[in-house]
Amino acid sequence: MKAFMDKEFMLQSPTAQHLYHAYAEDMPICDYHCHIPPREIYENRRFDNIAQVWLGGRNPDGSYFGDHYKWRVMRSNGVPEEYITGDKPDRERFQKFAEALPMAIGNPMYWTNLELHTFFGYDGVLNGDTAEEVWNLCNDKLQHDPKLTVRGLIEQSNVAFIGTTDDPIDSLEWHKKIKEDPTIKFTVAPSFRPDKALNINKPGFAEYMGKLAAAVGKEKLACINCVTSALTDRIEFFAEMGCRASDHGLDYIPYREATKEEVNAIYQKVMAGETCTPEEAEKYQTYILIHLGKQYHRLGIAMQIHYNCLRGVNRKMNTLLGPDTGYDMINTATCGGEIAALLSALNDTDECPKTIIYSLNPGDDAQIGTILGCFQNSEIPGKIQHGSAWWFNDHKIGMEEQMSRLASLGLLGNFVGMLTDSRSFLSYTRHDYFRRILCNLIGQWVEDGEYPNDEKALEKIVKGICFDNAKRYFNL
């Protein structure tokens, strides 16, 4: 019997073990998509206790922050909400999580133990009985160990690049301060997330467009030309601040062509307080997406598209706690044709940007895999990417399926690899988790005689997927 999470964790063959230890284990990390606050990096925040890091709490504006994965585990174990997002003492909240964790057999939440081993040197197993021991150990280190500040965690994880997620109206003041601080050796760059400027059919759109106008020094954005001009202005500002990628979180990918005059009329209608039809919303969104895609191409910014998430489906809890509190699910929208149409429209004028496509529904993997091959060109290997297994899929089965599907339909060797998509500074162990799964998958193919035992080729593939491909793709 293998020991729990030993040095050969998830590496089930001699070839897998060799590939991991020789080529994957010590590679730098390019965390090109995450949700960590740049302010906490600049201020080098030190956390008071492990519950703050893992379970989060409330922001000054009343919204919630924390790890949705852990919240869902606790809810699934019958833990009252007051211990999850409520105001119970942190020690009690941590106890409830520790008691729930043993029930998570087969769940990737067990990477919690990988975090304890990697950052705190704890080789035991967290459960209700060991919670006090772990609480005391972690809190002592968090409060006193210089390696366990925010920057210390990033540095000891060998992170070379962090791409945060930022709204177009953000001043990027913390990014500016990070760039000017010579003691910060890793790169932190903003990513352009213009969802609120596309959500013409959702509450708060007109108010947001007023904020976008203010961000570009205007009293208002009176027409669709004003909107595209403002977005271009902000993209260029982000590019000056080192932006390498955009990100679009869409319920589904729209594609409905319209003239500028039609789109302007739709925009004017909504800004006047009227409601647009779903078809009108799609016309506006398509027009803006095409404009943005052309700007990304011009500036060398990669376009990330995340879709097929149905958000806030528990109406009662969504009303009580707000969005992004763990009440989202996989959707079943079918929009492969629309993705292809969007890329084709951009390709017509040779303005299709580097694009990474993520669907929350793993049933879309084959369709995405076939889309990729339709729009590749000589600009860069793997210009159109199938994004890493996302959110509800970033576990062993999901990662193996995504990479196997990509290998079957495209070139796995050009894959840009893993990202944390996380709000936690302890989450860099997810890259290690991914690398072990990657090496085990490739190692098994070699062991089974499905790929030659070519050391040079295997080294290039493993190092590429772990870091080198992302380094090239994002111009690091």
Stretches found by the model and what they are:
Residues 303-305:
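C-terminal amphipathic alpha-helical interaction region
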Residues 332-339:
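Divalent-cation-assisted or electrostatically stabilized phosphate/pyrophosphate-binding catalytic cores
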